Amino acid sequence: MTAYSDKTNQNDNTNSKQDTGVEDWMTEIWDWIDNHNIAGSYDSSVPREPEALRQLERLDLGYGKSTSYSYIDNKSVLQSESESTEPLPSAIGHLKNLKYLRLRGFNELPEQIAQLHSLETLVYMKCSFTEFPKVLCKLKNLKSLKILSKSLESFPNEFGNLSSLTHFDMRGTQVQELPDSIGNLSKITSIELYANEALKALPESIGNLTKLEKLEIRASDLKTLPSSIGNLKQLKSLGLYHNGLQSLPDSITNLKALEQLDVSETLLSGVSESVSRFLGNVGSKVTW
């Protein structure tokens, strides 16, 4: 790909590398991208200087069938779009300015990925792990996590260590329950859970998320809500569309900030008198 990673140029001496500002970790990443690409798919717009990685803020891996380098909103963006059969290089931990990372189709991740201290957004797609990787739970500055994975079945307790998380979006998984440690995510304001057909319940610890404003649970096997949901005093939108929900807890009447409630296509067979009055007060904001 570049003179720094081309095997025909491996005789360049160390002084030459120092003069150009190229470090070994840069070459390691570009070598990986070279091997990762489908033959003939490489885009000539990708810069030939590995040192450009110093400023990289967005990395899309496994998006399509080509590689490109561009600027989006004045941010350095690298897209290596073919799905990978090779593990990420450990050198990825050197991308100190990386704020956005998209992973697709991986079955192995290096421990060094936890060194991405500037990472704010992670998109996790079609990776083959059955448990969410613990190493990703070390991303203490992560603010947004989006998961789309049919293979995923569970989360480790370490999930609660994502202390900066404000938005969590999970779709199409086989997860049956969220970990109790989700209650440690004190900054979270939005949770969206779509088409997780095996999801049966929410942990009581969900009530600890006092900054939560939006909770959407659609197309799951959810049958009840924890009574602690009444602690979500900032909750404005509660979507429970197309679930197996059979009842609503009395504590739902404590949701004074609620502006929108969707309980359409559920199995609600009856609610208590207090819940009925509450729904009446919410009025047109309720979708049945």
PLM feature spans:
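The feature encodes a structural signal of leucine-rich repeats
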Residues: 46-47, 88-90, 109-113, 132-134, ...
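Conserved hydrophobic beta-strand positions in leucine-rich repeat
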Residues: 59-61, 98-103, 120-125, 142-147, ...
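Leucine-rich solenoid repeat scaffolds
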Residues: 248-288
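Leucine-rich repeat
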Residues: 53, 94-97, 106, 115-119, ...
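Conserved "Asn-ladder"/turn position within leucine-rich repeats
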Residues: 64, 82-83, 104-106, 127, ...
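LRR N-terminal entry segment and analogous cap-like coil->beta motifs
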Residues: 23-105, 120
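Terminal targeting and flexible regions in eukaryotic proteins, enriched
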Residues: 1-31
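Intrinsically disordered, low-complexity segments used as extracellular stalks/linkers
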Residues: 13-16, 99, 117, 130, ...
